[in-house]
Amino acid sequence: MFNDTPQMVSETDVVVIGGGPAGATASTLIAQKGYKVELFEREKFPRFHIGESMIPETYWVLERLNMLPKMRASKFVHKHSVQFVSANGRQSAPFYFYDNKPHECSQTWQVVRSEFDLMMLNNAREHGVNAHEGVRVLDVLFDGERATGVRIQEPDGQ
């Protein structure tokens, strides 16, 4: 990987750009397979983000990431159903997850993204991911068709 002054920073197998849930998930799963992963996130966590409502199917991914014990120990609100309300106030009947799929996964969480995203990023670190916060990826460097590194901007602007 390279910074603005094309100087080699490190050898790695995989670079992941973005440390939100998708980036943290991808980097953790790759690291679990034994690859050396560098993750770059332009923001410093925790940071505000929209999108708090999880669905039951996230259980299986959280299980693969070894996140279930952390989620169970968290103070996030447990979610057992959904109900929809239209703009005119009309409400649907509640949809209880357990009625559709009687399994432990039928309970999920309503998360605070700033806290959840930090938990996910720290979990990636626990699995060996070298996560860099406050670092912007400016460009992906190629040698022909092969990506060979990234050009980054450090928090101090370098």
Language model regions located:
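Short, basic and Ser/Thr-rich N-terminal targeting/leader segments
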Residues: 10, 77-80, 133, 146
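N-terminal FAD cofactor-binding segment of flavoenzymes
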Residues: 47-89
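Short glycine-rich hinge loops at helix-strand junctions in the catalytic core
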Residues: 34, 66, 128
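Glycine-rich FAD pyrophosphate-binding loop
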Residues: 15, 31-50
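Beta1/beta-strand and adjacent pyrophosphate-binding region of the FAD-binding site
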Residues: 6-20, 38
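Conserved N-terminal helical subregion
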Residues: 86-158
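N-terminal Rossmann-fold NAD(P) dinucleotide-binding loop
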Residues: 23-24
